[in-house]
């Protein structure tokens, strides 16, 4: 069930590829434990848990997505900032 949208404005990848921080604007309530769908390239995407949500201002938030539990993969993308939108779900 989709509960929010998140519009990406900045991306902060981790060099060891264990997590990515996304900063942007939220429409709807986003909480720790929800999931977001991340598209790694045109044909490969994955659903990952949101492990932390930091409120920066009104509807500005920073999401910490954790890949520690996911299978090994290589982050092969950097999003089109301002054009990427995530659907946030309350279940996987």
Segments (PLM) and residue ranges:
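Beta-strand/loop-dominated core regions that host nucleotide or nucleotide-derived cofactor-binding catalytic loops
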Residues: 2-27, 35-92
């Amino acid at each position: 069930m989709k509960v929010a949208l998140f519009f990406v404005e900045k991306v902060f990848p981790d060099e060891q590829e264990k997590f990515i921080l996304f900063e942007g604007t939220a429409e709807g309530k986003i909480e720790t434990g929800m999931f977001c769908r991340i598209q790694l390239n045109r044909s490969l995407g994955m659903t990952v848990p949101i492990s932390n949500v930091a409120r920066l201002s009104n509807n500005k938030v920073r999401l910490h997505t954790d890949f520690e539990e996911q299978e090994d993969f290589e982050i092969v993308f950097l999003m089109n900032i301002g054009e990427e939108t995530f659907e946030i779900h309350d279940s996987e």
